[in-house]
């Protein structure tokens, strides 16, 4: 049994910018939590960043010292959060995420290939796209 929290994140938008949604899959031992949320009109990068932020915000205080790995298929997000890139856009959102990261003792980010055979990444993508589709159909 894995003793770390894995967070798979994805953002989707119809048009860029356009109606956008996020998908998050959190895994810890035998627990699973999924987040699917419409976030209004946004760019794909804002959706990807928002998914990461929501995933980190979903971690309970009692688990802040548990090792956490955030998986993203966004090179943009991975670069901003691991290579200390200076954001030219979305500055406030990036700052909020960087501030959130200071609350965790062991936090890492891993870049994964989008639309690969990783079932949790596929699920995060589905949650993000369904958030856009369901909101647009209301």
Label each residue range with its predicted role.
Residues 1-46, 50, 57-59, 136:
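RNase H-like nuclease fold core
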Residues 5-16, 53-123, 127, 132-138:
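RNase H catalytic domain
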